[in-house]
């Protein structure tokens, strides 16, 4: 599973990097975190978390600095979080998280992306109850038992620790993600491949042929929207 999360980050970076969409999305997220608290990551845990994730996605330093500088200025642009749930082909389910300065625009765009690409937008809660929110931490290593003990000693609420092909994946309660990251740092972990809050599907579906092609187009349409920050789904090996 650890390789899965690392591959997702790598794939998104490769796909979005050419158009700088990923930079723009992190720029908004950094701006919001800095605006809501101190613009100093050493004094603002939420900001530090977003910056760390941006670095994992290879966002350049000048993009990060520009977003923080914007938050320090007189700009008073307001962004609102949103969530849109829906369905794709053959039992696939999708959750779309947004961060936008224009809710009406975003809702219309997401609905259009669903409708024009083989999906259907559902009501709030129609999909999310079949997902579990968890913290996900991925880093190089192979001793899952030792990591599990370290986290328990630090009083971190750990759901699971997996080791696969030189990569360790830690699943925490969502409220303990930051605590888990700090505990691992205290125990010598210097670099993380993934540190994210994720919506984990309780079960997955396998898509093939036309269904898989339709699903890929749907996900691409959703992720290409500037206001969409994260897209979660229940399709295996995608």
Swiss-Prot record:
SUPFAM superfamilies tied to this protein: YebC-like
BP terms from Gene Ontology: regulation of DNA-templated transcription
Superkingdom classification of source: Bacteria
Keywords, alphabetical: Cytoplasm, DNA-binding, Transcription, Transcription regulation
CC per GO annotation: cytosol
Cell compartment(s), UniProt: Cytoplasm
An MF annotation (GO) of this entry: DNA binding
PANTHER family: TRANSLATIONAL ACTIVATOR OF CYTOCHROME C OXIDASE 1
Family: Belongs to the TACO1 family. YeeN subfamily.
The protein's name: Probable transcriptional regulatory protein MGAS10750_Spy0264
């Amino acid at each position: 599973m650890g390789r899965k999360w690392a591959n997702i980050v790598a794939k998104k970076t490769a796909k979005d990097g050419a158009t700088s969409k990923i930079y723009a999305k992190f720029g908004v997220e950094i701006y919001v975190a800095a605006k809501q608290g101190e613009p100093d990551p050493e004094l603002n845990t939420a900001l530090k978390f977003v910056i760390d994730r941006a670095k994992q996605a290879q966002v350049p330093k000048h993009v990060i600095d520009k977003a923080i500088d914007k938050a320090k200025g007189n700009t008073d642009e307001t962004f609102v979080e949103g969530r849109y749930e829906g369905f794709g082909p053959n039992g696939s389910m999708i959750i779309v998280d947004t961060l936008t300065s224009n809710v009406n625009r975003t809702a219309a765009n997401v609905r259009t992306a669903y409708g024009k690409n083989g999906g259907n937008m559902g009501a709030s809660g129609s999909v999310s109850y079949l997902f579990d929110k968890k913290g996900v931490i991925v880093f190089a290593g192979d001793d899952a038992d030792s990591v599990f003990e370290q986290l328990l000693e630090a009083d971190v609420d750990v759901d699971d620790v997996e080791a696969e092909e030189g990569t360790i994946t830690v699943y925490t309660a969502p409220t303990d993600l930051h605590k888990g990251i700090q505990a691992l740092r205290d125990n010598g972990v210097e670099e993380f491949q993934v540190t994210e809050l994720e919506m984990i599907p309780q079960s997955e579906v396998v898509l093939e042929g036309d269904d898989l092609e339709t699903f890929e187009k749907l996900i691409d349409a959703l992720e290409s929207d500037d206001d969409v920050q994260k897209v979660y789904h229940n399709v295996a090996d995608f």
